[in-house]
Amino acid sequence: VNVGIYCDSGINGGHEEMLKRFMLALITSGNVQTLHILVPKSNAALHRYVSELARHNAKVRMVSLSYTAESIRGDLFALFRAIRSTAATLRTLQLSKLLIAQGTIVSGIAGLFAARYARVRALSYLPLVDDGPATESSTDKVKWLAKRVMYRMPDEFVTLNEHLRGKLRTLAPHARTMILENYVDDRFSRSMLTKSAARASLGLPDDGTTVIAHIGRINFKQKRQDFLLEAIERHPEAFKRTIVLIIGEGADAARLAAMVDASPTLTACVRIVGPKSDVLPYIVASDTLVLPSAFEGVPLVMIEAVLAERPIVVSRICGLDSYLPDALLFPAGDHDAFVERIFAARDVPMAALTSDFRRRFSREVFEAQAQNVMMPATPSRGAYDPAAPQPSDLLAK
């Protein structure tokens, strides 16, 4: 088959990392004759990655986009130009299917509309699915109606778990829906690095001090680093012999630094580390990781932490309770429960959960699923693909 991948993101987050692994899976597929990858030239890291793939693999063709989703946001004329030029390109490629990387249903819309105008079958790779209007305001209701229309545009969806798949069946009942579980590098579960060695390499004390880490894009709306800081300030005694590492970069980095600098309580225990290309030493050095997000797909750091046999405390959102036991979950927005879970997490047994994650999130499983979702659909558009990963029975025991 002759297939394509479209990504107009200007950032490189977890979804873009999984997209790179998706590309590699398709390159190894004997059923894929040509893989056309459309990426923005201004996303230097992603563009360079795809350029290298094309240089080393004869079946890969790169198409450079002159825009990113961020550069055309709020500019209808720029959006129309992007749709028209991309649709013209798609007509020349003669694709049997185009995978469109969408962080949410309103991202990647230039590719979605272009596929519709070019009459190319569109597969939305969607890690986040909306629940409904945020408030009862007229503005939010109108936005929700617009989103409902957009959920009806893709011919197919691939998402991350059964919880999200169920929501898509409601919003897009006539589209085929499939599951593609994330995976992470085997080194997280095979590393010989010890906690003491990791702490020594990072200049962290190994004297009984508790080390807690938050790893992710610094974005208060989603990742809620501000909530973590609020929890520390509300429970200063609990964090007296604790170091809290915040690893990452993002739009709210300056606000985060200002909050820490303005508070003696936070200054005493919080260390803003910044972005790191290799987070494994920070995971291994930690007693507990935290992810108090407002919304998530299936966060890679959750998988990485569990594979490294480190507990991670996450908010009970978006079906994440199907991955972790109750002892590692807390009600979103509950500071007290969050802190309680953090300091109890060290006693949560991880071996069985790690073994389950190692099986569930393997490269072999991911590649087989990735290759399958790009094949021509055998059901009609009104049916959903019944094939899905077997759910873990570990949490039911």
Positions of PLM-derived features:
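Conserved acidic donor-binding segment of nucleotide-sugar-dependent glycosyltransferases
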Residues: P325-D336, I342-D347
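Nucleotide-activated donor-binding/catalytic signature segment of Leloir-type glycosyltransferases, i.e.
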Residues: H56-R61, A257-G274
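A conserved mid-protein helix/loop that constitutes part of the nucleotide-sugar donor-binding site
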Residues: G13-L24, T210, R217-R234, A251-A254
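A short helix/loop element that forms part of the nucleotide-sugar donor recognition site in Leloir-type
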Residues: S189-P205, A352
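An aromatic- and histidine-rich active-site surface loop
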Residues: A45, L79-A82, L98-A118
